[in-house]
């Protein structure tokens, strides 16, 4: 997501033990990783090409991200979500407020990412999250006010227009999203003042309005989020901030806990990751190429700077088959 958006939720819940379900859904029944081992940072603000797709190799994350196949229609302020096969990049400025949803094929990522579907309404600064069957794109600004709409994209029918399935409890823009196999969480954002709100979407009852859960410890907007099967990590914010908050999915009515910060204060960034690490990339002031890695197993120290983006960007999104 989104983004974060959560991408790569692929395990069938009724086929897995509770222990395995607590892993992120980018692992199969035998906990063998599913999907290619990369994260993708997509689009972003000028200067430069808004269609750029930059790939981080998790197995070699000190290297500079590699430029891959571009978006058919470049964009900034998009949202991203996906499964183990495809990443979907929705909305944004392309160059005006857009309904476009582009699809990145992880197994053919040097190809142009084509336009596949459309949102029910054009929006910028929205957030994306999903499971193995659907992506959900929520919030944002269609202009002139914030939106509460949550659109659902069916991966099995991804050329159709998305359906409005739910609404956020609080309409807002510049929010982030992340989730596990059961729920999507939309956090922070701007609805006049910055918000601490975290709304939870129940995938099994996705026509219901989202439910407000435990809040962020700090009001945050223009933030990013990623996580694993147990925790969500929310990082960065306008001011800018280096803040990272952690939500425990097993206790999601409690306030998020402050964890180790990013290496540099920033906003308008993106995040993605795998079961072990979260990668927070790009952002502002100006446009930044920094990628910070958060170690989920040791999340109280300051994040570690890893290989940078090949092109500095702000207002970008991110997605991964391993998230």
What would you call each of these model-derived segments?
Residues 1-323:
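Polar, enzyme-active/binding microenvironments
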């Amino acid at each position: 997501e989104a983004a974060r958006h959560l991408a790569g939720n692929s395990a069938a819940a009724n086929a897995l033990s509770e222990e395995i379900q607590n892993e992120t859904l980018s692992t199969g029944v035998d906990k063998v990783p599913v999907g290619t081992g990369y994260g993708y940072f997509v689009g972003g603000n000028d200067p430069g090409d808004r269609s750029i797709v930059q790939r981080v190799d998790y197995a070699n994350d000190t290297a500079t991200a590699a430029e891959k196949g571009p978006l058919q229609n470049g964009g900034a302020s998009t949202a991203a979500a996906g499964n183990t096969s495809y990443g979907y990049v929705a909305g944004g400025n392309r160059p005006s407020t857009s309904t476009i949803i582009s699809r990145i094929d992880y197994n053919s990522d040097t190809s142009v990412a084509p336009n596949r579907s459309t949102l029910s309404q054009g929006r910028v600064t929205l957030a994306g999250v999903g499971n193995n069957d659907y992506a959900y794109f929520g919030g944002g600004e269609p202009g002139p006010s914030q939106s509460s709409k949550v659109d659902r994209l069916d991966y099995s029918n991804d050329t159709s227009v998305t359906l409005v399935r739910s609404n956020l409890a609080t309409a807002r823009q510049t929010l982030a999203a992340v989730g596990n196999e059961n729920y999507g969480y939309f956090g922070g954002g701007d609805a006049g003042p910055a918000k601490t709100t975290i709304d939870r979407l129940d995938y099994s009852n996705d026509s219901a309005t989202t439910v407000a859960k435990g809040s962020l410890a700090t009001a945050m907007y223009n933030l990013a989020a990623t996580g694993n099967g147990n925790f969500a990590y929310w990082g960065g914010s306008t001011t800018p901030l280096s803040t990272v908050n952690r939500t425990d999915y097993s206790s999601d009515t409690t306030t998020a806990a402050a964890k180790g910060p990013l290496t540099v204060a920033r906003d308008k960034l993106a995040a993605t990751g795998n079961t072990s690490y979260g990668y927070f990339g790009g952002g502002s002031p100006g446009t930044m190429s920094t990628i910070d890695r958060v170690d989920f197993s040791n999340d109280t120290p300051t994040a570690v700077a890893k290989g940078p983006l090949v092109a500095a960007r702000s207002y970008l999104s991110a997605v991964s088959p391993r998230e």
